[in-house]
A protein has these predicted regions:
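Extended alpha-helical targeting/anchoring segments
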Residues: 1-543, 549-550, 554-559
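Short, solvent-exposed loop/turn segments that connect beta-strands within catalytic domains
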Residues: 74-76, 468-473, 652-655, 734, ...
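Active-site flanking residues adjacent to catalytic metal/cofactor-binding acidic residues
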Residues: 358, 575-576, 752
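Acyltransferase
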Residues: 534-560, 755-790
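A short, charged/proline- and glycine-enriched loop
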Residues: 564-571
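Flexible gly/pro-rich beta->alpha loop and the following alpha-helix that scaffold active-site loops
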Residues: 571-575, 579-662, 667, 673, ...
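Pocket-forming structural segment of enzyme catalytic cores
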Residues: 639-662, 667-764, 768-772
Length: 790
C-alpha cells in the first residue's frame, strides 16, 4: 500500500522551485540525498493559469532504479553514407543498424549508479516495454499519478529508432539519449484542489522526514524570485544571412515537391554559472503548462524547459496531442497586441502551416488508434507571455492490442518540430542543421504502464547545460520555426529570435528590456474570413453512426497470402508512399467498410513484384497514396499506374480492378499516360482549402460543384494527350488539373486530399470509389465525417 500524506496549500508563484530547494537543503533530494537514492533531480511543473493543461506539478524523490540509453559506437551504428541530398528527394531509407539499448542501473547507497543489465529492442517501444517488469504493483486505492512509474527524458536523437531514415549527423559515442527514473517517491502539488501530497512506495525514513519538513516549510514558505541574469557573451551557430539563405533553400525544395513544411532550428550557446537559476527565472517570467527541470550529475547534465506544447497525453486508452504551429510576438500596447492576434488568425500562411500539423497528427494517432476514433477536437489561440500561438487538440482511442509505448513510438518526435511529410523532413533537417539536436524537440514526461497514465511534452523553449563540475557550464538554446513555400526569409529569422529571446535573457541577460510581456489567455480562433468559417464548420460537425470497421493490416513480402473476399466485400490495397497523411486515408476507407491492406511503396520493405503482390492480396480496389518527391521515387506506384492504364491490373475474373491515385499517385497516373509533370505555374500550395470545379463523373456522385478541398502539392500534371480526361480543375483559374479519369477503365486520380480536415465532404469521393466494382454493388454506406467531433 502506498504511503501518502496530504496538506492544503494555495497556488503561488515560485512554489515548486522553492520547495525543491528546501528539500535539497534537508538532504532529501539531489546530491545530498545519497543515503536514500541517486542524485538525479526531476521536476515536472505546470505553471500559468490553472487549466486542464496546467494543473499538476510533481517533484521526484531520490530514485533507486533508473534506465539510461547512450549513443552506440560508430561500429554498431555508423553514420549514413551520403547518396545525395534529401533536399532533392534522395533519402537514406532503412531501419537502424544497431538495436535500441537501455541499461538498467541501481543505486548503491551513498556511492554510485551500478549497471545491472542491458536490454535491447529493435525500436524504441519494444526496448522500453522490456522495462515494465521493473515496476511495483499498482495501489488500487489511489487514482492519478502514483509512485513506481517511469519519468524522465527522451532526446530527439532517439528518432534513430522511431523513423525509417538513416542520419548523417549522430551524437558522439556514449552521449546520453534517454534517461527514465523509476520514481518511487513523488511530491505532488494539485493546483486545482489546492493540495500538496507526498507519496512513496514505502513508509520509510525518507517519507517521514519529507512529511515533517514540508509541514514546517508550509508555515512560512520562502518563494523569493531569482535575480536577473548577468549579461554575458553569446555565440550563434550561424549568421542571420546564413539563416535567411537556408529558408530560401527550403522554399526551393518545397517548390520542387520534396516536402510541404520543414522545421529548422538554429543554436545559441555560451558559458553560464547556474542552470538552476536559469530555470527559476524562466518559470517566473515565462510560465508554461509543460515546464520541467532535470539534473543528472554523473553526466554533468542539466535541462531547463518552459514548454507550452504537449506531444502525448494518455488516460487509459484515450490519447491526445496538441500541436502548436502559427506564431506572432506579443506587443507592449493592448491595441497592438490584439492586432497581432487577429493578424495571426487571418494569415493564410499561419493557418496553412497549422492545418498541415492537424492532418499530420491525425495520421500519427491513426497508426495506433481504433478506426473511427481519431478526431480534430479543438482549435484555439493561446497567448503566452512573449508569443501568441495557434493550438489544436487531436484525440483518438488506443487500440486494445497496443500500449503507451506504442503510442509514443508513433508520435515521437512531434510533427510540429520536424515537418511534413515527417520522414522526408527529418532527413532534410539532418542535412541542414548538420548536428544532432540532443534534447531540443525531444520529450520530458512520464508513463505508467500499470495505469495507462502518461504525459510527454515537446522540448521547445528549453536550455541544455553540460560540463558543470566546477560551476562552469556550457549552455545551449535552439529555436526556429516551420518553413513553408510562403515563408519570408527575414521574418523567419526574426521569429526564431522571438522564440529564443526569453531563454537567452534568462541565461545570459541578453536583452530583458526588449521583450514585451502579456497576460496569458486561451480563446477560440475568431471567424475572420470564409476559410476559417469553413474550417470551424468542419471542426464542429457532429459525427454520424459508424459501421463496424476492420482494423487495417500492414503486409510485407513473405507474409501469409489472403483468401478471396466474399461477394460484396471490399479489400483495398493501399500503397503507402511515405506520406504523413496516409493513415487518414486508410482510416477513412476502413470506416467505409473496406478491409485495408497497407503495403510500403518506398524503402527496404517495398514490394518490387507487382503480380506476386496482387495474387497474394487479391484486392478489389487499389489506392496509390500521396508522398514526398516525384513519382520516380516510388517505383511500385509507377508500375501499378502504368499497368492500370494498359488494363493489366485485373482480378481473377479478368475484370479491371478500380484504381485511385491521390496527389503523388495522381501524378504517377498522369506521367504513365505521357502527360507532363512540372512545378505548378501558380506556385506550391500546401494546407490551403480551395474551391474545385467537378465534372459529371461517378467519382463525384452526390457532390456539389464547386466544392472546397484541401491542397498539398507543388507539382501539377499538364495534359499532352487524350488517353485521360480532366474531371476536376481549380475554380480560381479553371486551368490547373485537379482530377483525371480514364475514359474506359476504372482509373482515377485527384491532386487534392479528400481525407483532410479541410475537405469536409472528401469522404464521399472515397465512398464513390469504393462502390465502383463489379463485385461490390449495393447501397452506399453512411460514415462519420473523418477526424471530426462536435
Amino acid at each position: 500500500v502506498t504511503a501518502k500524506k496530504q496538506w492544503p496549500v494555495d497556488d503561488r508563484d515560485g512554489f515548486a522551485p522553492a520547495l525543491l530547494e528546501f528539500l535539497r537543503e534537508l538532504g532529501l533530494i539531489g546530491t545530498s540525498a545519497s543515503e536514500y537514492g541517486g542524485p538525479d533531480e526531476l521536476l515536472l511543473q505546470s505553471s500559468g493559469p490553472i487549466s486542464v493543461d496546467s494543473n499538476f506539478t510533481s517533484i521526484a524523490g531520490p530514485p533507486i532504479i533508473r534506465i539510461t540509453s547512450q549513443q552506440p559506437s560508430r561500429l554498431r551504428q555508423p553514420e549514413a553514407i551520403s547518396n545525395g541530398s534529401a533536399l532533392q528527394g534522395e533519402i537514406n531509407l532503412g531501419g537502424p543498424q544497431s538495436t535500441c539499448d537501455w541499461r538498467i542501473e541501481q543505486w548503491e547507497e551513498g556511492c554510485k549508479w551500478n549497471k545491472r543489465v542491458t536490454v535491447e529492442g529493435n525500436d524504441l517501444s519494444s526496448a522500453l516495454r522490456e522495462m515494465n517488469h521493473l515496476l511495483p504493483d499498482l495501489d488500487s486505492n489511489l487514482k492519478g499519478l502514483q509512485p513506481g512509474c517511469f519519468a524522465g527524458l527522451l532526446t530527439y536523437d532517439l528518432v534513430q529508432w522511431t523513423e525509417p531514415v538513416q542520419l548523417h549527423h549522430l551524437p558522439p559515442t556514449g552521449a546520453l539519449l534517454g534517461l527514465l527514473l523509476r520514481v518511487d517517491r513523488w511530491v505532488i502539488h494539485d493546483r486545482s484542489k489546492g493540495t500538496i501530497s507526498v507519496l512513496s512506495t514505502h513508509h520509510d525514513e525518507w517519507f517521514e522526514k519529507c512529511c515533517e519538513g514540508i509541514e514546517n516549510w508550509l508555515i512560512t514558505p520562502d518563494t523569493q524570485q531569482e535575480s536577473l541574469a548577468e549579461k554575458s557573451s553569446l555565440d550563434s551557430t550561424i549568421l542571420d544571412e546564413e539563416h535567411s539563405a537556408i529558408v530560401d533553400t527550403v522554399r526551393r525544395a518545397i517548390r520542387d515537391g520534396q516536402f510541404y513544411q520543414l522545421n529548422y532550428g538554429r543554436i545559441w550557446s555560451g558559458r553560464l554559472q547556474d542552470p538552476w537559476g536559469v530555470f527559476k527565472r524562466l518559470v517566473a517570467t515565462n510560465p508554461a503548462p509543460y515546464s520541467g527541470w532535470l539534473s543528472v550529475p554523473d553526466y554533468d547534465y542539466s535541462l531547463a524547459s518552459v514548454s507550452p506544447e504537449l506531444l502525448l497525453s494518455m488516460n487509459g486508452n484515450e490519447l491526445s496531442t496538441r500541436p502548436i504551429k502559427g506564431t506572432r510576438p506579443r506587443a507592449r500596447s493592448r491595441g497592438r497586441d490584439l492586432a497581432l492576434k487577429r493578424e495571426l488568425a487571418a494569415s493564410r500562411k499561419e493557418i496553412s502551416e497549422h492545418m498541415m500539423l492537424v492532418d499530420l497528427e491525425r495520421n500519427d494517432l491513426g497508426k495506433v488508434c481504433a478506426v473511427g476514433s481519431v478526431r480534430w477536437h479543438d482549435w484555439r489561440i493561446e497567448s503566452h507571455p512573449t508569443v501568441h500561438h495557434l493550438v489544436s487538440d487531436v484525440r483518438g482511442r488506443l487500440r486494445d492490442d497496443l500500449d503507451g509505448w506504442d503510442a509514443l513510438q508513433a508520435l515521437f518526435p512531434g510533427g510540429s518540430i520536424t515537418g511534413c511529410p515527417k520522414t522526408a523532413t527529418i532527413a532534410a533537417i539532418d542535412e541542414l542543421e548538420a548536428t544532432p539536436r540532443r534534447a531540443w524537440t525531444g520529450s520530458l514526461g512520464f508513463y505508467d504502464p500499470r495505469s495507462g497514465l502518461a504525459c510527454w511534452n515537446i522540448l521547445i523553449r528549453s536550455l541544455e547545460a553540460e560540463g558543470g563540475l566546477s560551476g562552469d557550464w556550457l549552455g545551449k538554446v535552439q529555436a526556429g520555426g516551420g518553413l513553408v513555400f510562403e515563408s519570408d526569409s527575414l521574418q523567419e529569422v526574426e521569429e526564431a529570435k522571438w522564440k529564443a529571446q526569453a531563454l537567452l535573457d534568462a541565461a545570459w541577460g541578453s536583452s530583458a528590456s526588449k521583450i514585451p510581456q502579456g497576460e496569458m489567455s486561451i480563446e477560440p480562433v475568431p471567424l475572420l474570413n470564409s476559410v476559417i468559417e469553413a474550417l470551424h464548420k468542419s471542426l464542429n460537425t457532429k459525427p454520424q453512426v459508424c459501421i463496424s470497421p476492420a482494423e487495417p493490416i500492414e503486409w510485407r513480402t513473405g507474409d501469409p497470402r489472403f483468401v478471396p473476399v466474399n461477394e460484396g466485400e471490399r479489400r483495398l490495397l493501399f500503397i503507402d508512399n511515405l506520406d504523413s497523411f496516409s493513415w487518414n486515408i486508410i482510416h477513412g476507407c476502413a470506416q467505409l467498410g473496406a478491409e485495408v491492406i497497407v503495403v510500403e511503396g518506398r524503402g527496404e520493405k517495398s514490394s518490387a513484384e507487382v503480380q506476386n503482390l496482387l495474387s497474394a492480396i487479391m484486392p478489389t480496389h487499389i489506392i496509390l497514396g500521396p508522398g514526398p518527391g516525384w513519382p520516380t521515387n516510388c517505383k511500385l506506384t509507377q508500375q501499378l499506374a502504368t499497368l492500370a492504364l494498359k488494363g493489366e491490373i485485373v482480378d481473377s475474373d479478368k475484370d479491371p480492378i478500380p484504381l485511385l491515385g491521390i496527389c503523388l499517385g495522381h501524378q504517377a497516373i498522369g506521367e504513365a499516360a505521357g502527360w507532363k509533370l512540372l512545378p505548378s505555374p501558380n506556385g506550391a500550395v500546401h494546407g490551403v482549402t480551395v474551391e474545385m470545379n467537378f465534372e459529371n463523373d461517378s467519382l463525384f456522385a452526390r457532390m456539389e460543384s464547386p466544392q472546397r478541398m484541401m491542397r498539398y502539392h507543388s507539382l501539377i500534371v499538364e495534359p499532352t494527350g487524350r488517353q485521360l480526361k480532366v474531371i476536376a480543375t481549380d475554380a480560381e483559374t479553371n486551368s490547373l488539373v485537379m482530377g483525371i479519369a480514364h475514359p474506359d477503365l476504372p482509373v482515377w486520380g485527384v491532386q487534392f486530399h479528400p481525407e483532410s480536415c479541410g475537405s469536409a465532404d472528401g469522404w464521399k469521393i472515397l465512398e464513390n470509389f469504393l462502390v465502383t466494382a463489379n463485385s461490390a454493388f449495393g447501397q452506399s454506406v453512411e460514415m462519420p465525417l473523418l477526424g471530426r467531433e462536435g
